[in-house]
Curated annotation (Swiss-Prot):
SUPFAM superfamilies: Ribosomal protein S16. Belongs to the bacterial ribosomal protein bS16 family. GO terms for molecular function: structural constituent of ribosome. It comes from the Bacteria. This is Small ribosomal subunit protein bS16. The lineage of its organism: Bacteria, Pseudomonadati, Pseudomonadota, Gammaproteobacteria, Enterobacterales. GO terms for cellular component: cytoplasm; small ribosomal subunit. One of its GO terms (biological process) is translation. InterPro entries: Ribosomal_bS16, Ribosomal_bS16_CS, Ribosomal_bS16_dom_sf. Keywords: Ribonucleoprotein, Ribosomal protein. PANTHER family: 30S RIBOSOMAL PROTEIN S16, SMALL RIBOSOMAL SUBUNIT PROTEIN BS16M.
């Protein structure tokens, strides 16, 4: 099953997340099909905290991809800000 979820990056105590489309059987930070955005929870000042390619996300959802709980909240926030 294809899912849209967060893959963690960054350093220890300084998380940075990629929003990726992946097979649900793959590891959290493992192989993915497509990168559709990022989320920086500790962004400060002028730094961009969230960027999502909503067109590609809607494309994958249309093909039957499931969305993780946290990513669904991020999508809702991105649509509200746009």
């Amino acid at each position: 099953m294809v899912t849209i979820r967060l893959a963690r990056g960054g350093a220890k105590k300084r998380p940075f997340y990629q929003v990726v489309v992946t097979d649900s059987r793959n590891a959290r930070d493992g192989r993915f099909i497509e990168r559709v955005g990022f989320f920086n929870p500790i962004a400060s000042g002028q730094a961009e905290a969230l960027r999502l390619d909503l067109d590609r996300i809607e494309h994958w959802i249309g093909l039957g991809a499931t969305v993780s709980d946290r990513v669904s909240v991020l999508i809702k926030d991105a649509k509200k800000a746009a």
